[in-house]
């Protein structure tokens, strides 16, 4: 397996979270969004998820990766990323034990479908636990913003179903 960590967060108890992806082969479809947890001493926290990792796809067999992470006040973990197969923005919410939080999105996973070519996503977690994400689209190459509420629903009054094509040229 080839695992990648794209972003880190620290829990109040000193445990370390790393979000990124794992790939079991060189095929792009084999890249799966993944969340890992380590103890304060750097050892794998085997009590988290499945042996220290929580691996879930945004939908079906879609490839993707995680690029944002926030530990919520109650210990739940909110992550954001991209699904390159369905070309969309995504978020997942986990309980502190690494299981999906089924009160978020659909079964713990939320998506905003948008044909963006599967690029990395910058994320801003707002004080009300809503999420603002940005990426660069392939065609046309412009910066695209997406916003979800704290339950994983697209903001209806933010662009078109939660997505704004800014018209500002970006670099792919």
What residues fall within each predicted segment?
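Extracytoplasmic mature domains of secreted or surface-exposed proteins
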Residues: 1-172
